[in-house]
Structures are given as structure tokens and as C-alpha cells.
Regions:
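A well-structured
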Residues: 1-312, 596-600
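Catalytic zinc-binding patch centered on the HExxH motif and its immediate surroundings
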Residues: 313-318, 351-371
């Protein structure tokens, strides 16, 4: 499929669109499910008075929740996929808004349930299981609802905190408005001598320029307004951190990190192991950066030189037809069952391929328990799009395995686990491409693509995670979070990670433009996810049939166990350091291969 001017939705060939008729043959099915959900909302709300009467009543309510949730989830997915395929279609936007409004109503009607389960004593909780053995099918779900026991205040106190939630979100909202709407950048001069206004959107183009003067000007121009507003950004970030620490304190946690990780049942050892091993392996990052410097022929490397491609443009391209066939072939190491799911994805038209006018940008995998796991793409004949395709196929296969193994209540998976399956696929594709494209330039490009992803995901996100924890600890210990103290903390960590790079003064204020620091200990999961995926893909490619079966069992597990326990069964104990060392072994091997090719 060639890259052409985007088509109108009705002009896209049917074979390049997803088949939503597999959900509902027409909107009539959507309307029927929506009406059913609305009819059940009063019963869901009224069950507050009866559901906890005894074990049988609780089981009946949980089964009702499953049925209603399945219907609203299906209706919502159908409507949001239709809305995303053409955002200019008002009828589909209205459909999506109606489904979302109904979902909010349903969520409100069932909101009483989790606090009610949480309020039970351990004895009362276990009594329900004695009365009704059928509740064992829901035990993990119910126990997960109780993980905050001991960390919940009285109803009156929680209600008071809830009313203050908008206040606690104020710093993040202010940052987003500043960063996305109010910040304006000066013009820069391009390689062609043209004056253009710098934006957050086009910055990546100019920071990758082959002209160092363009890179330097883009870098300095980007940071100028952030430095001008450094006290304001220090105030928003400091207030955000104080909010996290306050919430943790009043809810009886030792720290904000403990509170944030507890909600996903992730032990703090996972975080510490990541930071420890990445720090131990920083010499590998320094080696990769030295290779970049040598390839660019620079006497010294600045922060604005780190994003220049060192292997040129991609020497290989795939159109969609080629990529679809190659993806099925590339993922064969995942076994016959996985292979059949890949063929099914194409045969049953799970994938909406072509870019069209009004289509949502980017790519994703989305589905409900009772639907196929659909994939949205905006295809261009570029190698990066091939990686996006196998990435999203990884999410969809994960969803398919989970939903075809687990009951509704365990039929999805946590954010902590989500990126592992998709990144595993990317790593397996890298191995396939290295075997298929053996000429020197292709090998260099594929290897550097992998190393750059590893650097951006594991090294950089761990750097962010280390800084995020540092400023939370500073505040908890009573140290003021001023622009000076924040910049000092950031620059010290950055200098450690990029020890062989000139520390341009602007980089001390990089923290001011990073939205992840307002996401409360979220960013580390990018790094743990890729590290686990790297270790797992290596086991799949070079291990035993038992290694593959353990991986497939992770795909099947859903929410049937805590995320850390699911990964242990897959062969990766994320509370220990072994999987991280395995991942860095792969990185070092790939780095040595690229070093050898670049020195020829």
C-alpha cells in the first residue's frame, strides 16, 4: 500500500478496515445493549441494601455486575472505534458520548461496592466464602478490592478528601496548561536558512538535524521559556510532590512511593532493583554514547547531539501487505497457537489499516471481553510502522489469550503487565529482521534502532524514576523544593547518566517540561516492562519449550493473580535483579555487534 493523500473514510478499501459488524450487525444491537444497561442501573444501585446479606446474595450481585459490565463495555468499545475511524462523523461521536455517559451512570451506581467490601472484617469476609463456595471464582477480585485495608480513613474523612481532589489536581492542571497552551517558542533557522517557529511538535525534527548549529539553536530555544518560568514550574512540581506525600501520610503509608506501588500490588523492591542495576550498567550507556560520538565525528558531544541518527535513513521498507505476511512469519517462535491467532487477526479483519481524513492519529489495540481485540493504525510504508504493527498485535494477542482463558472478572490485565507482551513482539521482530536482512547497512540500522529504543526506554525512564523518587524523599525529609534544589538534583543525576557528554546548562531544567513527573510513580513501568520483555524474548528465542509455555501462561493469566506473581510464573521475578542482568546482556551483545560493524 503506497503512501498517498489521505482518503475519505468511504473511499478506504474494505479489506483495509476493521470489521465492526462482528460486534453488532448494525447500531440496533448497540441500542439494545445500551437500553439493557440502563434498565439494570437501578438494580445495581439498590443492591447496596441486599448484596451483602449472605454469600448467595453476594454471588448473585457479582454475576449481575459481570453481565452489565460486559454489555456496557461492548457498547462503549463499538462506539469509540466507530468514533475514532472518522472523528468528523457526528453521528458516531454522539453514539460514543451516549455510551460513555451510560458507563459513568453504571460506575456511579456500583461505586458503593468496593468501600463496602473494604469495610468488612477479615472474619466477615471469610464467612461469605463458607456460605457460598461459588464465590471462590471471585476471590482474587474481592481480595484485590481489600488491598487498601488499613489505609482508608473514616467515611467522613474520605468524603472531605474527595471534595478537595480538584485542589490536589491543580498543580498538574496548571502544568498542562502552561506546557500545552501558554508556552511559546522563538523562531529558529533551519538547514535551508528558513525561519520557522519552534513547537513541541516539530522539535524532534530539528534536534535530529545533521547540522549541529540547527540542533544547538533548537535545544536552546526550547529551554528558554522553561528557564524563564523556572520558579513557576518548580512551584507546580513541588506542589504535586507535596500532594503525593500528604495523601500517603494521611492514609498510613510510609511514603508516596509505597502508596503508589501498593495500588498495583508492586513491591518497592522492584523499583529499587531497577535503579540499582541500571546504575551498575551505566558504563554500557557511556559505550553507546561514545559510539554515537565516533559516528558523528565530533570532538565533544553535547546534550543536543544525542538524538542524531547515526545510521542514516532506513535502508529497508515494508508496505502493509509485505508487513502483514512478514509479521506472521516473524512471530512463529511464539508457537502454533500464537501463529493461528495472528492469522485470525488478518482473516477476521481486526485491523483498521489506512490513514483517512478525520481518523484518530497514532495506533492502539482496543477491545472488550466479548469482542475481538481490534487495532487502529495509520499506515505508512516505513519500518517504524512495521514495529507499530507487531507491537499492537502483541497487545491484541495478550487480550485474546486472556479473554479466551479467564472468566469476565479476570478478563483484562494491569498496566504494569500491558507493555511486556507488545515489547516482546518488537524484540522478536528485531531478531527476525537481523536474520533476514544481512547486508551491512540494514544490520547497522536494525541494531541501532534496537539500541536506541533500549536507551530511551530503560536508561532514560529509569533516570526519570530515580529523579522522581529523589524529589519525593527531599520533600518528605523537609528539604524545600525550589527551582535551585530541583535543578541541582536533576543535573546531578543527568551528569551521572551522561558522564561523557557536555552538561549544557539548559539540561538542568529538563524536569520542567516532563509531564511524567505529575503521574505519581508511573514512569518506572516503561523501564521494567521493556527489561522483562527483553529477558522473555531471549528465553523464547533461545530457551526451552517450557520457557515458551511459561510465557503463554502469562498471556493467559489476566487478573487471576497479582502482577508480580503472574510474572514469576512466566519465569521473571521482578523483585530480583536477574531479569535486568539478562536484559543488559542482550543490550551488550547488540552493542558489540554494532561497534564491530561501525569499525569496518
Amino acid at each position: 500500500m503506497a503512501n498517498k493523500k489521505p482518503l475519505r473514510r468511504e473511499e478506504v478499501p474494505v479489506e483495509l478496515t476493521w470489521d465492526l459488524s462482528a460486534i453488532y450487525e448494525s447500531n440496533e444491537g448497540f441500542e439494545k445493549d445500551l437500553e439493557f444497561v440502563k434498565s439494570q442501573i437501578p438494580a445495581v444501585a439498590a443492591a447496596k441494601d441486599t448484596a451483602l446479606k449472605d454469600g448467595a446474595s453476594l454471588l448473585a450481585f457479582l454475576n449481575l455486575l459481570n453481565v452489565v459490565d460486559d454489555k456496557i463495555e461492548t457498547a462503549y468499545v463499538y462506539s469509540h472505534l466507530k468514533a475514532d475511524q472518522d472523528t468528523s462523523n457526528n453521528e458516531n461521536q454522539v453514539l460514543n458520548q451516549r455510551a460513555f455517559s451510560t458507563y459513568i451512570e453504571f460506575s456511579g451506581a456500583s461505586a458503593w461496592f468496593a468501600p463496602a467490601i473494604l469495610a468488612l472484617s477479615d472474619e466477615e469476609f471469610e464467612e461469605y466464602f463458607k456460605q457460598e463456595p461459588g464465590l471462590e471464582d471471585f476471590r482474587v477480585l474481592l481480595e484485590t478490592a481489600r488491598i487498601k485495608k488499613g489505609h482508608v480513613l473514616s467515611d467522613k474523612e474520605e468524603a472531605l478528601l474527595s471534595k478537595a481532589s480538584e485542589v490536589f489536581q491543580g498543580a498538574s492542571k496548571t502544568f498542562n496548561l502552561l506546557n500545552n497552551a501558554d508556552i511559546k517558542f522563538d523562531e529558529i533557522t533551519t538547514e535551508d536558512g528558513e525561519k520557522v517557529e519552534l513547537t513541541n511538535g516539530n522539535y524532534s525534527v530539528y534536534i535530529e538535524s545533521k547540522n549541529q548549529d540547527v540542533r544547538k539553536e533548537a535545544f536552546e530555544t526550547l529551554y528558554k521559556p522553561y528557564i524563564n518560568l523556572k520558579n513557576t514550574f518548580a512551584s507546580t512540581l513541588g506542589t504535586e510532590v507535596k500532594g503525593h506525600n500528604f495523601s500517603a501520610l494521611v492514609h498510613n503509608y510510609d511514603s508516596a512511593r509505597q502508596a503508589a506501588l501498593a495500588s498495583n500490588q508492586v513491591p518497592e523492591e522492584v523499583y529499587d532493583a531497577l535503579v540499582d542495576v541500571v546504575n551498575e550498567k551505566l558504563p554500557l550507556l557511556h559505550r553507546y554514547i561514545a559510539l554515537q560520538q565516533k559516528a558523528l565525528g565530533l570532538d565533544e558531544l553535547h546534550m543536543y547531539d544525542l538524538y542524531v541518527p547515526i545510521t542514516g535513513d532506513a535502508p529497508i521498507k515494508y508496505n502493509y501487505q509485505e508487513a502483514s505476511l512478514a509479521s506472521v512469519e516473524a512471530l512463529k517462535p511464539l508457537g502454533e497457537e500464537y501463529h493461528e491467532i495472528m492469522k485470525k487477526a488478518y482473516a477476521d479483519r481486526w485491523i483498521d489499516v489506512a490513514e483517512n481524513i478525520g481518523k484518530r492519529s497514532g495506533g492502539y489495540s482496543s477491545g472488550a471481553y466479548s469482542t475481538a481485540p481490534y487495532i487502529l493504525l495509520n499506515w505508512h510504508d516505513e519500518l517504524s510502522n512495521f514495529f507499530t504493527l507487531v507491537h499492537e498485535l502483541g497487545h491484541s494477542a495478550h487480550s485474546y489469550f486472556t479473554r479466551n482463558t479467564q472468566p469476565k472478572q479476570y478478563g483484562d490485565y494491569s498496566i504494569f503487565l500491558a507493555e511486556i507482551a507488545s515489547t516482546t513482539n518488537e524484540n522478536i521482530l528485531t531478531d527476525y529482521l537481523l536474520k533476514k536482512h544481512t547486508d551491512k547497512e540494514a544490520q547497522k540500522y536494525i541494531l541501532n534502532n534496537y539500541l536506541h529504543r533500549f536507551k530511551s526506554t530503560i536508561f532514560r525512564q529509569t533516570q526519570f524514576a530515580e529523579f522522581e523518587h529523589k524529589i519525593h524523599v527531599m520533600d518528605q525529609e523537609g528539604q524545600p523544593l525550589t527551582q535551585e534544589s530541583i535543578a541541582k538534583a536533576y543535573s546531578e543525576i543527568n551528569a551521572k547518566y551522561y558522564a561523557n557528554v557536555i552538561q549544557d546548562e539548559q539540561i538542568a531544567y529538563e524536569w520542567a517540561r516532563i509531564p511524567h513527573f505529575y503521574m505519581n510513580y508511573y514512569v518506572f513501568q516503561y523501564a521494567t516492562g521493556m527489561a522483562a520483555a527483553t529477558a522473555l524474548s531471549d528465553k523464547i528465542l533461545h530457551g526451552t519449550p517450557e520457557d515458551l509455555e511459561a510465557y503463554l501462561n502469562y498471556l493467559r493469566a489476566g487478573r487471576s493473580d497479582a502482577p508480580i506473581e503472574v510474572m514469576k510464573k512466566a519465569g521473571v521475578d521482578m523483585t530480583k535483579k536477574d531479569y535486568l542482568y539478562d536484559a543488559f546482556d542482550v543490550f551488550e551483545k547488540r552493542l558489540a555487534q554494532l561497534e564491530a560493524l561501525m569499525s569496518e
